[in-house]
């Protein structure tokens, strides 16, 4: 077996900026205060590794001079200001649709995609136990907005031709009076451009 870091990524890098203290420096027991880091993770995957073969169409992704496929994701990190006071463990959350929900579910905190206040800390469960909390994006079709985490992904192609196919979208009217939807079905999600304006080829059920 190979180390997971080699399987998933090579030549990775982080571009982070410190955005100050969580909850204006509130102390969480012996762990102390937390700091907020925001930025991007720049990653590479080897399409030839068997462990990456489950990624759909990875064999059609554009490779760089190293033979790997480059992509980037936004990251949001909350960590002890003094890392030596933390527990040395990372709590990683893939946010659904780019949203940050770990503090809401584990700390009973007020929901927020930009956690920074005492209300966003909730009961402090994860903080008092010294976890470093990391969020990253996993969907490449999200639109920027509402502090959602987004990605920068390459486009897979058959040679020079774009890959096309049938797209399935679900429309859910979650509130009374809802009459219009984007083609993607979600205002936060990018719609796929059509290859044909012939509506007879479309199906609505």
What does each model-identified segment do?
Residues 9-205:
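C-terminal His-loop and adjacent cap/lid subdomain of alpha/beta-hydrolase
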């Amino acid at each position: 077996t190979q180390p997971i870091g080699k399987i998933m990524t090579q030549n990775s890098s982080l571009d982070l900026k410190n955005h100050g203290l969580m909850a204006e420096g509130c102390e969480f027991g012996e762990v102390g205060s937390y700091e907020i880091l925001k930025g991007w993770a720049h990653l590479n995957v080897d399409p030839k590794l068997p462990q990456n073969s489950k990624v759909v169409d990875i064999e059609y992704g554009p490779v760089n001079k190293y033979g790997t496929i480059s992509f980037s994701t936004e990251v949001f990190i909350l960590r002890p200001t003094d890392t030596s006071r933390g527990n040395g463990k990372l709590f990683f959350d893939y946010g659904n649709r780019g949203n940050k929900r770990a503090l809401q579910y584990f700390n009973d905190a007020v929901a927020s995609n930009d956690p920074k206040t005492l209300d966003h800390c909730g009961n402090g469960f994860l903080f008092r136990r010294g976890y470093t909390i990391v969020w990253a994006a996993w969907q490449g079709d999200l639109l920027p907005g509402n502090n959602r985490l987004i990605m920068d992904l390459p486009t897979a192609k058959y040679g020079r031709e774009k890959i096309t196919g049938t797209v399935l979208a679900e429309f859910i009217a979650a509130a009374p009076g809802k009459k219009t939807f984007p083609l993607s079905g979600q205002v936060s999600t990018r719609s796929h451009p059509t290859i044909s304006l012939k509506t007879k080829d479309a199906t609505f059920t």
